[in-house]
């Protein structure tokens, strides 16, 4: 019997070691703290307390006091106090209110941040030191930690791989409510690039070296390596690039291996589309991204539609000095067009030199030769032209295939003279500018303008493709494609020597990827710039930001047309809007 009694006692003692299942009996509310971040951080710490502890007891109040202290310390409040008040609520758990008195805040009394080693002369570190907090601001632990991280990250980005903090302290004086930053960072020496090698490349090393933005002996900079992953693919010679740096602590150098994966030797592109101006059209492109070890390439394109057909092949020769930005293009092409009162066949040859600069501008200059056989209105002729051409372009786009921001600038200058065996003399200048901007996400504005000037003694000797016509999509909507131009006595289109078109379009997003549009266009294709030659059109439309680009549908009509035209024109198109 005694043994049985002892067993029961032992069982009772064992069970008593485990607390009964606790239950939340109060809700907590913290009051008296100002500042969104301080409130959020304090609430976060309080909410980390297990719900089973929320019974309103002194133990729970102690846990809340500690949580409040942790939440406020990081913002410079080291002497906070908490007074608790418990309120009963009918039909709800009691409410425990924590009345917090943060106390006097601790403020920064001084910052002592020193840089030793080669980084002491580095302007980037000096710039970082200018961002220290000013005396008198509240001390925040996160600001201190972020600054330390910024120094460490900058050191790694700029090649100070041996850098370390000899001193890093946040000193607090609760009695005086003051704080001091103490940091001493020893950067050591800055590493430099060592051997730079290429692997798997089909292009000669001397061409690749002139694409590099670094050379052996240059100071290390991580951004340089990031640029390489975009520079080499932009040549179209490679499908992908892998940059592998190897840090050598003994020699204080960084060897770089650039692994290049060549593109396939042949690439084909097929496309089918529809537009009101050209109807159904198809396109076939064939490209050889690289032909030899000097990076020469060939691209060809065939375009077919009812009114227009083109075939063009271009041979590109990059220059050794700067293969990405300096190159020659040699092109041969054929074009046929039968539209309105135009029937033309053209054979073209060109040799152009291109220069690309760091600001996005592309300049070109060279020679063009063309043989035209054409009928325009009632005149049939053949002509051979040889003329120099120069120009420049710039394209800036953001937002993918349906740009939210961007602009395109173009200008060309052509000069033909009989003195160099060209059958017609002329001067032609043509410039265009297009802009797209998005405001407050839902408001989009597209603006375009184009001007052209052709000086010649006899426009009938100039091929139709060099004359000016207006009307249609991307010109003056409300009119048919190339229907605006001077006419002869028989009412047939001749083409003009002056061109001016403008367009302003407003779009509003009515649904994700869907935009309603309204627009007004104006322009002329004439023999002089006069107000009476201007044509106006206005309309409305819909835009769909599809994965392959903008698909649009427009309805437009002329305004105050001098021929009293009231025709309504419909436009359907696919592609970039500028």
UniProtKB/Swiss-Prot annotation:
Swiss-Prot/TrEMBL GO biological process terms:
protein secretion
* GO CC terms: cell outer membrane; TAM protein secretion complex
Major localization listed first in the record, in broad terms? membrane
UniProt signal peptide:
1-22
Which controlled-vocabulary keywords does the entry list? Cell outer membrane, Membrane, Signal, Transmembrane, Transmembrane beta strand
Q: Where in the cell is it found?
A: Cell outer membrane
According to the lineage, what is the superkingdom?
A: Bacteria
Any Pfam family from its record, for instance, is: Omp85
Membrane-traversing stretches? 265-276, 279-288, 297-306, 309-317, 327-336, 347-356, 361-370, 387-395, 406-415, 428-437, 444-453, 500-508, 514-523, 536-545, 549-557, 569-578
Keyword Transmembrane helix carried by entry: no
Protein family = Belongs to the TamA family.
Relate the protein's function as given in its record.
Component of the translocation and assembly module (TAM), which facilitates the insertion and assembly of specific beta-barrel proteins into the outer membrane.
PANTHER family assigned to the protein according to its UniProt record, in alphabetical order: SORTING AND ASSEMBLY MACHINERY SAMM50 PROTEIN FAMILY MEMBER, TRANSLOCATION AND ASSEMBLY MODULE SUBUNIT TAMA
Q: How does it assemble?
A: Interacts with TamB to form the translocation and assembly module (TAM).
Question: What's the protein name?
Answer: Translocation and assembly module subunit TamA
Q: Which organism is it from?
A: Haemophilus influenzae (strain ATCC 51907 / DSM 11121 / KW20 / Rd)
